Amino acid sequence: MYRAVIFDFDGTIIDTEKHLFEIINKHLNHYGLEEVSLDFYRQSIGGLASDLHQYLEVQLGSERKEAIYQEHNETSIHLPIVTHMKQLMDYCKVSHIPMAIATSSFRNDIKPTFDQLGLDTYIDVVVGREDVEEIKPSPELYLTAVQRLNYNPVNCLAIEDSVNGATAAVNAGLDVIVNTNDMTEKQDFSNIAYVGKDLSGTAIIEKYFEKSRG
């Protein structure tokens, strides 16, 4: 049985990725500019998103680009926890299984949503962009989270939604379950050695926790 669970945040615990995509195109439409395509946006998920940031900077300028991310951070507090992740977190909480978040976002950017959802009652450790030199697909976020939980990577299960995130987890030595969303379901996971994909909270609990107890 795994002794700890490390979650990605955006697109895994809450569906912020679709939310941001819609906000970006709302702002581009407002200024009469061409929308970002879904394929282009999907390439940015789970990592640095430098191409997306550069595109928005060129099209909108720095101030208007930052307004997009400010609106995203302020309105994400209204998004619910993904049902399957809530089930898993509830199980881990009552089973005294430590939980962490390893996110390529800045901790301060996710804090309003983190606080609104009451995630402090579940999550023991949060590792963000400001805590590492390199973000996903580098394994550094996961290695840092594992270290702060004081466990070995092989004792920890990662939950991810993107290729970049899953790559980071695997390269850090963790087993990973990939639960995709509308924005990541068409990514190519064929080179990812995941242990499970698109599983319900109940299935994760039964297969990777309850069954291993027996």
Regions found by a protein language model. Give the residues of each.
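A structural signal for short, well-ordered beta-strand elements
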Residues: 34, 45, 78, 103, ...
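Conserved phosphate-coupling serine/threonine residues in phosphotransfer and NTP-handling enzymes
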Residues: 12, 103-105
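Conserved SAM-binding loop
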Residues: 13, 81, 99, 134, ...
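Non-catalytic, surface-exposed connector residues within folded enzymatic/regulatory domains
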Residues: 18, 35, 79, 104, ...
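Asp-based, Mg2+/Mn2+-dependent phosphohydrolase catalytic module
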Residues: 1-3, 90, 106-107, 111-214
